[in-house]
């Protein structure tokens, strides 16, 4: 689950991470009043959406007066902000963060994620703040420094000092950086976060460290332990089809292609998308119905697939284990009849009751195309999607 910048900063501040003073507002008048309360001087008006690249898209503006803050907020609130992470359709801005302006001496990077190879949290720092860490990793990987955190021992003082020296901070800022990293770990650990990122972490002219921007995402599987975090979820920022799929325990992610995919198992789903691309097509989605899906879930999955107007053909790739092939066939047949599906459907299934499932498809009187291998299925569905 993602949250907004202002929400992430509030969580980090509660755990001791220093952040700039600011207020989130939903209209231009409130922006002017917020700017007044922040001293009436230089403030930054920042669009709040679940995407990076807001500045380049025109969603972050520095202003010098409350009146200018009102004018800029009126321009930003309600705009369809397009960034490299939103796609060409953009994301509608519903609120802005009005934040105190600061004199910046240096911009650094500080982040924390789960490292899958070591199965431990890893804290990362870089002197190259203000740019995407992926770009730094690609172009100047030697400027990224990491420390792996033992999940029970936590972040050690010597690790924090080592990273502070790697950043090139000096004097009292070393201890300040150490305390900030400890606070970041506390927030990460306490909230079951999957990512915490401060980019940039700034050093002011006075030598103070502050989180100028913040991003947090959380493990959905742990949200039952954090009802307070669940309340921060902004459904307006999420794809409506993804929200609908989550109601039926379906893992759905919308993509930009024309071949709809329905698969059981995340690994098989990713392999299916790969083989569609190898066949010259583009997947329209990632859809994992899970190993124990029933006919009703299959029907709901189909309904969600068909809600995407870009889908020109559907590939169903199922390995029948807990989800038997006859149950799959029952759900698919019911969905196609009830929803009046008109796009071509290619089905490849193997496993429990596969012959029974294939016979049900043949007896349905519906125009399904079957395939025995993944490559055959991909070639057929790509041809029919053109």
Task: Give residue ranges: language-model regions.
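Catalytic core of bacterial c-di-GMP phosphodiesterases, primarily the EAL and HD-GYP domains
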Residues: 321
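ATP-dependent carboxylate/acyl-activation modules
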Residues: 1-197, 202-316, 326-328, 337, ...
